[in-house]
Amino acid sequence: MRTLWILAVLLLGVEGNLVQFELLIMKVAKRSGLLSYSAYGCYCGWGGYGRPQDATDRCCFVHDCCYGKVTDCNPKTASYTYSEENGEIVCGGDDPCKKQVCECDRVAAICFRDNIPSYDNKYIQFPAKNCQEKPEPC
């Protein structure tokens, strides 16, 4: 219960898409994105540099690249719509930019779910000094 309260407090100042991304991760991967992926490896969390450390970190790298291709809206604040059909997340709405953001988040949530076995606690709060290699291109 305390963890849920802390999570709620942390999300109070967050708008739109980041909250939706958290909810999507919880729905698809059955984990809290905030607790599991906000400070993991070289790419999960704010920013990112170097080489992804494992398959989970690569999910964040690909998600960052996906957000980087969004040009007509801010992917961190754009609110989108989605539904669940036959157990799959389907991005909807009429705004192509918001739909693109939803697709970035949907693919990342599936990637997190599919790579849970690669998750390694040694990459939680991973020091930035270990992420100095030249990044690979998106």
From Swiss-Prot:
PROSITE patterns: PA2_ASP, PA2_HIS. GO terms for biological process: arachidonate secretion; lipid catabolic process; negative regulation of T cell proliferation; phospholipid metabolic process. It comes from the Eukaryota. The keyword Hydrolase applies. GO terms for molecular function: calcium ion binding; calcium-dependent phospholipase A2 activity; phospholipid binding; toxin activity. It is an enzyme of class 3 (hydrolase). Residues 1-16 form the signal peptide. It is found in: Secreted. Its cofactor is Ca(2+). It catalyses: a 1,2-diacyl-sn-glycero-3-phosphocholine + H2O = a 1-acyl-sn-glycero-3-phosphocholine + a fatty acid + H(+). Keywords: Calcium, Disulfide bond, Hemostasis impairing toxin, Hydrolase, Lipid degradation, Lipid metabolism, Metal-binding, Platelet aggregation inhibiting toxin, Secreted, Signal, Toxin. Its EC number is 3.1.1.4. Disulfide bonds join 42-131, 44-60, 59-111, 65-138, 66-104, 73-97, 91-102. Ca(2+) binds at residues 43, 45, 47, 64. One of its GO terms (cellular component) is extracellular region. Expressed by the venom gland. The active site is at 63, 105. Snake venom phospholipase A2 (PLA2) that shows very low inhibition of ADP-induced platelet aggregation in platelet-rich plasma of human, rabbit and guinea pig. PLA2 catalyzes the calcium-dependent hydrolysis of the 2-acyl groups in 3-sn-phosphoglycerides. Belongs to the phospholipase A2 family. Group II subfamily. D49 sub-subfamily. This is Acidic phospholipase A2 Cvv-E6b. It comes from Crotalus viridis viridis.
